[in-house]
Amino acid sequence: MDMQSRIRRLFQASIDTKQQAMDILAPHIEQASLVMVNALLSDGKMLACGNGGSAGDAQHFSSELLNRFERERPSLPAIALTTDSSTLTSIANDYSYNEVFSKQIRALGQPGDVLLAISTSGNSANVIQAIQAAHDREMIVVALTGRDGGGMASLLLPEDVEIRVPSTVTARIQEVHLLAIHCLCDLIDSQLFGSEE
């Protein structure tokens, strides 16, 4: 297969996964946006975490809220728990890498805040511990997962929301996670500041 054919095949695989996910995920993304907007209207904040590409997604989400998405508007409170290398490495060194997010949540999280927990497999131990810490702090969890939801899915409470991408391919799951994050940002803005359509 030549390279351009391979590129077209990858584009098509991404399109197919998004089309398959669209109707499945729409109600879950809507529910997650309602949870987030309710928290923001109640003076809550968003915390976000994940590893690797999911850490990048957590930072992307946080930056879109803190700065802006596609319109001028006031900044919204969001913290990516993946960015402070001194905090991450001190917790990993003194305790365990599995606690790098949970210790931050126990310090920063308040009842009514929302944790956006991101893992393509749903099995990242430090994200699982983050969910447990969020529940201890009476926070609501929005989980971005894939595959079968992994250990994260089994921890979620009735008020939590899982956005589980119907795929087993990590790259496709990540692509849909980014789209879901953009949908959340759009829905948050439209609910708080009115639709621009």
Curated annotation (Swiss-Prot):
* EC number per UniProt: 5.3.1.28
Please tell me where Zn(2+) binds in this chain.
H60, E64, Q174, H182
Alphabetical list of HAMAP family matching this protein: GmhA
Tell whether Isomerase is among the UniProt keywords. Answer: yes
According to UniProt, the reaction catalysed is:
2 D-sedoheptulose 7-phosphate = D-glycero-alpha-D-manno-heptose 7-phosphate + D-glycero-beta-D-manno-heptose 7-phosphate
GO (cellular component) term, any one:
cytoplasm
Alphabetical UniProt keywords: Carbohydrate metabolism, Cytoplasm, Isomerase, Metal-binding, Zinc
- Top-level class of the enzyme under EC nomenclature: isomerase
User: Cofactor: bound how, per the entry note?
Assistant: Binds 1 zinc ion per subunit.
**Described function:** Catalyzes the isomerization of sedoheptulose 7-phosphate in D-glycero-D-manno-heptose 7-phosphate.
Every SIS domain range: 36-197
Species this chain originates from: Pseudomonas entomophila (strain L48)
Q: Which pathway does this polypeptide act in?
A: Carbohydrate biosynthesis; D-glycero-D-manno-heptose 7-phosphate biosynthesis; D-glycero-alpha-D-manno-heptose 7-phosphate and D-glycero-beta-D-manno-heptose 7-phosphate from sedoheptulose 7-phosphate: step 1/1
Q: Which cofactor does it need?
A: Zn(2+)
List of residues binding substrate: N51, G52, G53, E64, N93, D94, S119, T120, S121, S124, Q174
Q: Where in the cell is it found?
A: Cytoplasm
Example of a GO MF term: D-sedoheptulose 7-phosphate isomerase activity
Further remark: The reaction produces a racemic mixture of D-glycero-alpha-D-manno-heptose 7-phosphate and D-glycero-beta-D-manno-heptose 7-phosphate.
Q: Which GO terms describe its biological process?
A: carbohydrate metabolic process; D-glycero-D-manno-heptose 7-phosphate biosynthetic process
Family (UniProt): Belongs to the SIS family. GmhA subfamily.
Q: How does it assemble?
A: Homotetramer.
- Return the protein name: Phosphoheptose isomerase
Output the CDD domains linked to this UniProt entry: SIS_GmhA
Q: Tell me any Pfam family this protein matches.
A: SIS_2
